[in-house]
Each structure stands twice: as structure tokens, then as C-alpha cells.
Amino acid sequence: MMTTESVASKTSDSTNGTAPTDIPATVARLRQTFATGRTRDIEWRKRQLLQLVKLMEENEAALAAALAEDLDRSPFEAYIADIATTAGEAKYAAKRVRRWTRRKYQLLELPQLPGRGWVEYEPYGTVLIIGAWNYPYYLTLGPAVGAIAAGNAVILKPSEIAAASAHVMAELVPKYLDNDAIAVVEGDGAASQELIAQGLDRVLFTGGTEIGRKVYEGAAPHLTPCTLELGGKSPVIVAADADVEVAAKRIAWMKLLNAGQTCVAPDYVLADATIRDELVDKIGAAITKFTADKPDGMRVANQRQFDRISGYLSGGDGKVTVGGACDASSLRIQPAVVVDPDPNGPLMQNEIFGPVLPVITVQNLHEAIHFVNSRPKPLAAYLFTKRRETRERVIKEVPAGGMLVNHVAFQVSTAKLPFGGVGASGMGAYHGKWGFEEFSHRKSVLTKPTRPDLSSFIYPPYTERAFKMARRMF
């Protein structure tokens, strides 16, 4: 078990004190292990998944300390957002992996009889998971659950931006998991590029759209299939009939969690004009209450993040009604609400990924739907309403990776639903059975008897009788 003291001794430099990984040798080792068939064994998969649960549960303090160092995360938020979610995903898969791997027999058409057909779930081989810094365990070890359940060898590439968390992962994974089949590679973007260049069997990347394109381009020469979990501007539509008090609390909570550095955090709100002022006031009140223990604001990940987000606020776009003070020396930003910024300005054209919440006034639901649909498809879309008709209309008319009504972000943390993007917000999906299937090749298998040879009518020379039989069968 790792101690919190060992975390504190790590530096923020992801390469300091860490021997560089021989990437070709690591890939070769994992490929060799996969070739032996070890990872295909169902009991091996279950053991690795249960060991991952132990890793998360036995090292909670060390994992939380690393998250505090990297992201100023509280122990409670570390637990619910990274530790418990990852462990829960692994427990869920361990209980069901045998069922998931069973052959799925299909009823064949008449021309295919006699015969049996089924789908065989086959692991891809050696796969790469490139994690994100904002939830360094859940977005790296979480996807690994599906990859392990599917029987793959797995390379984990944590983000160098969350350096302490990456170090913890690199130290703990070999102690709990099969190091010849599951390996951690630390490093920056160059390490990711070198890994992709090895021509691995599948890649899952979580991060921004711009880097996602580069990952896709790097994988293309090898025809490596990719799962891309990207981002975008996730809207919240607050209808005129919404429970404004509850909506305000839930929106504020998620915008503050991890300092708003969450891919499915509310990026902006579209508020009906009749409740706009009340909503803004109550979001402001919720922010004030929720941040009483952080009067200096929320710390963002690094200088680049701080400069980008503070730049949105200093641009003078829209009316700042709450917060907005920035301290460059501590990288802290007071959570801000900005009312009616320019829809074509930087604040509304770029994913914010920080504690700044624009609120746009709309006159009706039609205007809100049109506003969302005039922009790239988001990773998540949210709606607050009491009316079934409003709910059904938004579900049907607003394309998004996922949607949640009357709350925010919970669609990501269930193993019973797939999580993924669409269009610019990504491709592919995982969690639960969908993660298993994402990392499995669905191989079609058909078997037929040789005697009696009922296929004789298809052999040349073709007769009129054979032609008549074919017409009846097809």
C-alpha cells in the first residue's frame, strides 16, 4: 500500500526521478503475453478487475493526496469522482464478465440451413488508453476496465499534467496487476505519439478535440481503430416551468466540482427570459454557499489554464454578476456567472473548462433548441423542466453524446448506460457492457455440416431445377 508521504515526495515534473520507459520493449512484452493466451482466460480477467478494486480501496489516502496536489481536490470529491467510480466500474465488470463473453447465437435464414451462427467476442490484442488530467484515475483506469474484461493486454498512458497522480498509478499498477499484461507508461505527448506509432490494436483517447484529431491522424497509417472521448460546449436548457431553485444548485455544484474542469460540466446555460433573473440570482447564491471555504477562488490545473480562463473574463464580454476575480500567483479564479456574452465571442466559441458560467437569455424553447443545434454536437446536453412534452421534444430534437433531464453529469457515472460523444465530441462509447464491447472484436462464426451435402444444387453446371430452387429459397 502506498503512503501519503510517498505522494508528497513526488515532484510536479512527470519525468523527474522516473526512468524513461523503453516503449518498443514494453509493447513487445505485452504483445508476447497476449500471444500466450493468458489474458483471454476469464478467471485472469476477473482477478485483474478485482485487483483493480483493491488498488483503489486500499490506497484511497494516497490517491486522494495525489489528486489534492495536482488539482486541489478535496478528499470527498476525490472519492466520489475518481476512486469510488473506478472501483465501482471494476466490481460491476468482474461480476458480469463471464456472461458478457458468452456466444450470442443467431437464428439463421432458411438458405443458411443447416448450420449454426453466432457472435464470438474476441479481444483486439494490445490496446492503448491515453488518459486525461482532470480525472486521472477514472479516465485512465476506468476505460481499462472494459479493455481488461475483453481480454486485452493494456498500456496505460496517464497525463503528465496530473504528475503526482501519474506517479502513483505507475507505482501501484505493477504491485496489484499483471505487469506483463498491463503496463503504465509515463511521459508527455511525445510518449503518446511513440506509443501510437507502434501500431497497436486499438486506442482510446480522452481529451480535447484538437489533440483527438492528432491521435486519430497518428493511428490512421496503421488502420488502428480509435475511441475518442472529446469535449465541447455542453448546454443546459432551463425551461420556464423548471424548478429554478433545484436547477441552480445542481448547475452550480457541477460547475464547481474540480473547478469546472470536467468534460461534461455545464458549459453554458440557456435560460427562459421569464426565469432568467431568478436563476442567475440563485446560481450566485449557491456558488457563494458552496465556496464559503474557498474565499480566494478555485485553483485551476496550470498556468496555461489560468491564462486562458482569466482571458475570457478580462475581455469584458457580457455582464459578470458573480465572482470573476483572478489571482495569477495562486492560479485561483473566483467562480463567475456571465450574463448574455456575445454568442460569437471567445467565451461562447471555445470550451470553457473552468469555473466560469455564461447564461444566455432565450425567449422560448424553440430558440434554445435552435441555439444548441447551430453549434457542434456536444458531449452532453442538459434540460430542466417539469413538463413531459418539453422533455420529449428536447430529447428528440437535440443531438448530443448523452442527455440528462433535471440533473447534471450523473449519466457519466452509471455502468448501465454507454458514455461517448458524437461528431466533434467524439466517437465510440464505453462503461459497463459497452466498454467490454468497445474493446472486443465481434467475430462472426458460421458452422455447417458436410453430410448430407445439401449445397449440391449450387455447384455448376447450373440447371433449370437449381434456378427454381434458388428463387424459392431467396
Task: Label the predicted regions.
Residues F34, R38, V53-M56, E60, ...:
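Structural signal for hydrophobic packing residues in well-ordered secondary-structure cores
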Residues V27-A28, T227-L230, N258-C263, S329, ...:
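Short, flexible turn/loop "capping" segments at secondary-structure junctions
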Residues T3, N16, D41, I237, ...:
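Conserved C-terminal structural/oligomerization subdomain of aldehyde/semialdehyde dehydrogenase
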Residues M1-W118:
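N-terminal Rossmann-like NAD(P)+-binding subdomain of aldehyde/semialdehyde dehydrogenases
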Residues R45, A90, G151, I182, ...:
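Residue-level signal for inorganic ion chemistry
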Residues E109-V246, V362:
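Rossmann-like NAD(P) dinucleotide-binding subdomain of oxidoreductase/dehydrogenase enzymes
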Residues G17, L177, E210-D342, V405, ...:
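ALDH superfamily catalytic-core signature
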Residues I23, I42, E60, V244, ...:
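Residues at or immediately preceding the N-termini of alpha-helices
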